[in-house]
Structure formats: C-alpha cells, structure tokens
C-alpha cells in the first residue's frame, strides 16, 4: 500500500504536469517528461490514472456532494451566503443553466481522468507484456478499465448523454467526430458495464496493494449499474412500478451476493467508527479515494481530500467554511416512535435534540453520528462542544453542520500547505450501501423476508452504536427492528428500504440520485422546498430563499451539458431536453 502511495505522489509531481489537460478530447503528455519516455513506462501510466481519483478541488469535487446532496432534501449549501461559490442553483433548481462554471470544470476534469485512463491503456497495449509480463499486464488493463468506468459512471449519472471516448477512439483520432448521442442511455451503460465486467472477471478479490481496484469493488459497481438501469431511462416514470426491469434486479442480487459472501468485507461493529480516519480502510470500505497525512506519509504536503475542503466547522478549523449543512428535514427524518421511523408524521413539528435535556421525542442513534448540533460534542469530543457561534450564517443556513467527512478536531488538519485540508478518505462504495442495494433488488424480485433481514441487521448495528461514542445522547436514542408486519407487501417494504437508505447514507453524497432513481424527485423536493423555508431553530428562521426553488420533472432529472462544451464542438453535442 505504501508503494502505491509513493507512486501516486510521483505521478502527481511528474505525470500530472506531463499529461496536463489541454483538451479533454486529445490530452498528450508534454513538459516535464519526454512523451515517449513517460508513455513507455506502463505501470507508472497506470498509477497516473489512479492519481486522478483524488485530482479534485472544491469547485469540481469528484465526490459530487453539490450534485448528490445539495440538490436533495438532505442539505443546504452553507458558506457566507447564496452567492458564495456557484452552487446555489443546485439547491433551488429553478435557476439551473448550462453556463455554470462549476459544471464545465467538473466535465473537463472528469474527461481529463478518462483521457489519463485511455493513455494508460494504450501504453499497456504497446509495452505492457514486455515490461510487466502477460499476467500483470492483463490485471493492469482490468484496473484501468475499472477506473475509466468509475469516471464514466459519474458523468452518465449526472449528465446522461455524454460522448464515449475510449482508447480506440483516441488511437484512430476520432475524438472530434464523436457525438454525445451516438449511444442511447442504456447503450452507454452497456459500455460502462463491459469495463466493470472485465475488471470483475480478471481481478482478484484481494490485491497486494490494498488500494487497487479488485473483484469485489467491480461486483459492487456492476450491481450499482444494473440497479440504476432497472428503473428505466432516468426520467420520471408515470406508470407506477411496472417499468422496473426484473432481469436487471436479478443481476443486482447476483453481484451483491458475491460481495456478501466475501470474507474480506462486512459491517463495522460501531457506526461511528466508519467515519474515523483510523478506520478508513476497514472491512466496511469496498472502494475509496485514498488520502494521507503529511506527518506520516514521508511527503512534504500530504494527499488531502480537496472535495470536502470547504466543509469543516466554522471557527473550529482554518478550513472551516461551513458548507454542506444538514437540513431540518433530514434531522426530522431521524425521529422515532416506539423505535421505528415516523414515516408520515416526521415533519409535522419542528423538533431538535438538546444535550442533557431529553424529552418525549426520541431519535435514531445515527443522527448523533451524522449531524453536528449546538450543545453536543463535535464528533464525540466534549472539549469541542458545538455552539451557535460555530455556524457562519445561521439566518440563511441554520445551525446544523456535517460530521461524517471531517475528522475529530483533536486530529488536526493534515495538509501542509497554504490551504489546509483533511486526510479523510472518500468512500466511493461501502459495504452497507451494497447490502441496501441488495435489499432494494430483493424487494423488487419478491424476496421480502431477506430484504427485511438485511435492513434489520443494519438497524441492529445502529442500535449497538451508542455506548462507545455517543453515551451522552443515550437517553434520547431509541431504535427498534422492523416486525414482519412491515414486510407483508412491497409498498410498505419499499418505504422501509428507502427510509433506511436515507438514514444510513445521509450526507454521503447520493440522496438525489436515489430520489431520481425511484421517480419521486419532483414530489419529494417540491414538498421539501415548501416546508424547509418555514423552519425555525430556537427562534431563528432560515432557508427563506427556498421560496424561489422548484424542481421540474422531465428536465431536472439530469444536469445540463455545459455550454462551453457545446460551443467548442458546434453541432456535435446535443443538449439534454428542456435546457
């Protein structure tokens, strides 16, 4: 694992410059290292492709938090106000346009990553067998195809119709002839699936370098692809559930079964441990973007998580800019009655816990691992108790803050540079996410009993996650397992599954994509906009700007193709519908 870190840093210092992005359609190494010399070292070209996993910045976060969380009912933008960064349209939708600089930069950087993968594949094709040996070369090709599929999954789930540019397109110099509508949505996913399938067929379950892609990561991603496709073309359906593809759901069951049966992955015993840096490569982590602390990795600066650099607590960190703020709607979703969610009544009253002052309202324990709240210790450390002063603009974004992506304050900042950041891995896929995908597919393939068993296993872990980290909230927590009566029909089982995904994966950057997959984004978000702007915390109103928010079905399911990309290749790309 240390060797892979070493090569990634070398790739950053050399190949990042050598293959700087001049144009995502035709990226060529130049500058620090001679092109032929760099290209003739296939294993380092592979490492340079891995380096792109973390080659992000707050204006183009590869974990997609502005596009998967901010755009949902789980969080508000945060910062100094609505004009702080260009992410405000993502939280109100009504002002979404193709001219966003953030859209354009993210598209550009993701295609730089695709280009890096294509360059590595061409290097492996030419030099791999002779320099690495046939078996190692075969594995490296599979790893790079996994990485390329990973980047394309992000592009296609965000923007839908994107140009497919692989190593053959590059080799034949067809980049400037490649349209974005050459393939349908499903055909594009077929290509992504083919890359993941090659990784699944070739790679071992365990790699010598722990951070490389492996068979289980590929199986997890294949399940995610088929789950996405099972619901149709990505736009909201109007015919109930008849459109759900049972064959694809069965594929989800099959691939998640591979993950379930692996002895190398499983649930961590305490939910809170998942989000501590010392557990970042635990059995819960199937694939993650790796980071490191400069004090421990023998580098000058370290490898920081730049996607989340804005999300620290105001007044607690030098990089605490107070972005990614949990919504009241999310906090209310953690309410319980007799240990079970208040599905229909959770948002009827505005409630929030106060440390040391329990009342009749009880909460799922995962709230206290997910949302930082005034009067409570921040991430389990009483010496760093949150106050109202730790919110930057409470009259706009309220008093809650996110906890999962930020380390405990006592750990300090872990990037040695003019900007400060954290060495917290970004989960791409974690074990519980895969098991919830499995439960979702089991419900749709009529195995409600096993789905209930999976969900109850996850709830049992949450029930057991009080004493170690959040004993101060013990008398405010209550969570129970679902009785059989909740899984007698698909309608109620779906409600339990969807609620569980929200609570378990809250603030992990995927809520919007769940809502879209289920075809309930417009109904859920427009109701949320109406309710959230009325919320009050201890007399303070906030989020009144949501009066201007509106989500339009048939348009907003996908983000627009950036205007600059349409301009650069006139007539080659078609805009998503209704933009």
Stretches with model-predicted labels:
Residues 1-30:
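Bacterial Sec-dependent N-terminal signal peptides
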Residues 21-71, 562-579:
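Membrane-proximal, proline-rich intrinsically disordered regions
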Residues 39, 45-55, 81-159, 175-190, ...:
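Conserved, well-structured interaction surfaces
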Residues 42, 75, 110-113, 185, ...:
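Long, intrinsically disordered, low-complexity segments
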Residues 156-157, 163, 207, 228-237, ...:
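Short coil/turn linking the two alpha-helices of tandem helical-hairpin repeats
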Residues 283, 289-392:
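Glycine-rich, aromatic-lined ligand/substrate-binding cores of catalytic
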